[in-house]
Structure formats: C-alpha cells, structure tokens
C-alpha cells in the first residue's frame, strides 16, 4: 500500500509537470525522478520513515516521507491509532 502523503506529493509534482511539459508521459516522468534524500535530510522523517525527493529540471522538490504502517503525517510524526490494537 502506498502512503497517502507519497501519493499527494506525487500528484502535486505531476500537476507541475503537466503545466510545464504537457506532452510527456507525466506519470513515468515523475516516478523515474524519485530519489532517496541526501544526507542533509537523513533525520527528516521520524519513526524510521524513509525520505524521498523528486528532482525536476535539476531542482529537488521538498522532501517527503514514506511512513511505516503505525505512523502518519508529513514527517511520520504521528502514531496511526487505527493500526494500534
């Protein structure tokens, strides 16, 4: 299952690409540019979340996190109470 924050960030990035380069296969264009964050953001995601960024035209967009199932939030900072039993 893909984290909602990741989906929202990808959709936002796709809107930017569509506005600037409408003739490209936007989905694949974005997916190919997702990279792990560099060391500057090694502690950006909390609770063992994984930090990613999208590089468009040699510019990295804001980092975003893929959270473990028990955490949510833009930086995985909240406990997902729905998954706690």
Curated annotation (Swiss-Prot):
UniProt subcellular location: Secreted
Function: Stimulates the growth of some tissues.
Pfam families: EGF
Gene this chain is encoded by: MGF
GO molecular function: growth factor activity
EGF-like domain residues: 33-77
Signal peptide: 1-19
Disulphide bridges: 37-51, 45-65, 67-76
Protein name as it appears in the record: Growth factor
GO cellular component, one term: extracellular region
């Amino acid at each position: 299952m893909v984290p909602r924050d990741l989906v929202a960030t990808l959709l936002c990035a796709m809107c930017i690409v569509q506005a600037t380069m409408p003739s490209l296969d936007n989905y694949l264009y974005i997916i190919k540019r997702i990279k792990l964050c560099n060391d500057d953001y090694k502690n950006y995601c909390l609770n063992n979340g994984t930090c990613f960024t999208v590089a468009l035209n040699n510019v990295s967009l804001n980092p975003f996190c893929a959270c473990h199932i028990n955490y949510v939030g833009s930086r995985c900072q909240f406990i997902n109470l729905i998954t706690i039993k």
